[in-house]
């Protein structure tokens, strides 16, 4: 949610409550934002954008097949290894990835 080049970049959601609150929107990745980005990207690039969005989904698909199978965390560290934090099974994260998958299916039939 903030560029790694920013002086306020805090990629890890760790520490006590105050530190976590400070880091909350300053570096961790929020999976629920992927749908808006991916759908806008596909509207601009259409079929030529499919391969990029499929590659973008690869990490999410891998994450959904580990630990709590079929789900995603609320947020992830902004730097590798992208450790999950917050809600373990966060519906908006899962719904967002499913929405992107469904949008990609529409492009397959065209």
Language model features with spans:
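Hydrophobic, well-ordered secondary-structure elements that form the walls
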Residues: 37, 41, 97
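Structural helix-adjacent loops and short alpha-helical linkers that scaffold large soluble proteins
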Residues: 41-55, 102-110
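Extended glycan-interaction surfaces of carbohydrate-active proteins
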Residues: 1-30, 59-110
